[in-house]
Each structure stands twice: as C-alpha cells, then as structure tokens.
Amino acid sequence: MITFKLKPAKEKYIQILLVIITYIMIILRFLLNEKGRVSPDSIRYMRQSEIFPVIDNTTAPLGYPLAIKFFTFFELDHFWSSKLVGLLAYTVILIFAYRKQFFFKELMIISSLFSFVSIFSFTMSEEMILPFVVIYFYLGRQIINQKYTLAKGSFYLSLCLIVMINIRYSGLFFCFGNIIFGLMNFRKNYWKTFGLSGIVGILFYGIYKFTFIDYFNEKYIDTFLEIGLKPTSQLLLELFQGMATTFNPFIHIADPNGGIINYGIYGIGVLTMLLMLFLFIKTKLSDTEKFIVIGSLVCIVLSYFIQYIYSVNAIDYRLMAPFSIGIWMVFFRKLFTVFGALTYTIGFASLSVGFLFTWLSKGNYLENRKAITTFLKDENLMHSKLKFYVKDLEDNDVQTAELISTVNPHIYYTFTASDTLKNDVLTRYKVEKKISIKKNKYQ
C-alpha cells in the first residue's frame, strides 16, 4: 500500500488551489468556446425560460428553465443566468459536502475532472441535478445509519427524488434504484424507507405525466416512444464508447472521425473501470457505499434499456453524469485509502489536460457574442421571435443558431427549405454574410 500523507495545513492549501483552478476552468471552458457551450437542447431550455409562463414543449421538466428564469430577475440574460446556475451547482456541492463531512475530498476531485468541468460550464440540466444527487446519497446514508424515522426518512428521500424528476425525467431511474436497494436489504430496518420513497417518486411521475405532460403535449408518447429505434449491435457499441469516455478521468470526448487516438481514450476509460471493479471487490463496501454504487448502476442499466423504446441521445459523459458521480465518489474514497494525498494529482492532471484541450481548440465567445448582438440590433431582431433554417440538427449550421440563442433565446428551428425565401427566416448564410464569426480550430 502506497499511502502519502500531508499535514492538514498543506492539504488545505492543495484543496484551496484545486477549487480555485476548477472555478477558473469552468469559466474558461465556455468563454473559450465559439458559442459559449450551448447545444440545440440549450436553446430549448433558454427559450422556455424566456417565454414562461407560456409552455411551448414538455420535452424536459421545468426545473432547470425556471432556475435560469429566476436569475434573470437580477439583470442577467438567460445565457449568463445558465452559467451562474452551473457555478452555483458546483459551489453547493462543495459547501454541502464540507458542512456534512460527506465525501468532501472525493467530490472536490470529481468536480475538477475535465468531464465535470464541461458539465458545469454547459447550459444543460445535468449541472443542476448534480447537487441533488449528492444530497440524495447523503440522505441514503442518514437512513442507513438510522438517523431518521421511517416517516421522516421517507419524506426527505421522496422530496429529493421529486426535485430530481422536476429537473430531469431520468431522475425517475433513482426511484427504481431505491426500490431495488430496499428489496436487496429487506431484512434490515431501513428497507421500507427506500422502497416507500421509490414508490412515491414513481407515483409522482405518473401524476406529473397525466396532469402536465399530456395536457401541454397530447402527442408526447407518439413522438418519443418508438420501439426498435436502434439495433442492439449499435446500442452495445454506443454503451461501450459512452462508458469508456464517461469513466476516463482525463478526456471524455472521442474523435468522431475515428483513428488511433480513440484507442488511447477508450483504453484509459476501460482500465479505470477495471480498477474500479477490482477495488470494489477487493475492499469491503460499507452499506452507504453499496447504496451509492447499486443505485448508480441501476440508473446506468435503465439508461441503456430505455433506448429500445424512447428517443434519446447516445449514452455519453453528459447523460451519465448524474449516474457516474456516485461511482466516482466511492472510487476516489478507495483511492484515498490506498494512495492518500497522491489522489489529488488526478484532479490537477485532469485540469491540465482540460486546459490544453480548451486552449488548442479555443474560440472567442465574447467576440462572437458582440458580433451577433450587432447583427440582431441592426436587423431589429433583438427581442423578436426568430426562425432559423437547418437541414437537420446534425448540420453545422445549427452552431450559428446556438450562438444567436445566447443573445435572443426566442428562436425556433424550421426544416422546410422553402422557408429560406422568407425575410423573417434566418440562415447561416444570411447571418455570416454580414458578420464574421470566429470558429474553433477543432470541431
């Protein structure tokens, strides 16, 4: 066993340095991106925040858009509000973990991993759900240690599950993880608390579906539920690639064009998972650690099987973030037991790789934002409802729409080519013939 110990004062300095660098990297991650780390889904979140209380879709819950909306009351626009949500999510995790003495060192390193830096800098709901996942695991520990009565524990855990479902529908998976963990421990006093709260969460989703989703979108089931979307061979390949990048502590994005570099990226992820498996088997897991690992694995398994009937993006580090964070927590706790303070080097190494990647592929969001703002003002479109033509959402033209959405989020896609003849429909060509947008060197 190679254990490296530091004096508390020196370890504290290392922790402070790691946190400061992580904050800086989160900010640089979106400022040095040509469009500020947004995606087509980000447009939907910011647009929903902009037009609320009007509901224009139920593809995602209202939790994240409403959080963005809240900070717009402090003179921030929707883009900057979303970035503040990410920074606050990171801050809440640190403060909560420190005050409760709950995996504090582990969560500090996890948050410094480049994949999680990318999450906190992304205008996506995963950033907001992460603090509640940590709180959920903490509540599980308290219940296992019998700190709560059946009623109190069930109430707190049910409330946390309901909050997560209101941020991401995949929060429902934690309900099933709850029930399975409870059934696996049916001889212990706390099993009823986990089972009951899981059932409450599922019942809440059922009520939510019939009273909210169906009310605003009667065709939700017809639109998103479709059996046989992808063959098993493709899903298994995507699962392997997604898991290998999710559990790569340094690089979470593979080269879509393939190449030898992907062998290294996937290889590191596979080795990390094998090391996790070895440590989890070799060292005895506590009941709390079992709860965290089992719940996380159930969510990952359900994320795979849901793809057979539900239209969703391929498994990747972002979709897996709420489910991988728990496994990372237990893994880093085991690494601290074996290597001590040397474990901090993983966080610093990941930040270094992340900075190199960010710098080599850097764009200039602030400059591009200035150009887009000028364009929208000149065209009197700053506060108008916009339409933007793209062939499909995989088209590179989408990036121009994403950039526009950071200034005016009230934008919709149109896929009808004839719409490009209309004056009120924007295209990439119409925008870029009037302004210059600086692109990332590496897409």
Predicted regions and their residues:
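Aromatic- and kink-enriched transmembrane "portal" helix at the membrane-lumen/periplasm boundary
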Residues: 30, 62-65, 79-93, 109-132, ...
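Membrane-lumen/periplasm interface segments of specific transmembrane helices
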Residues: 190-274
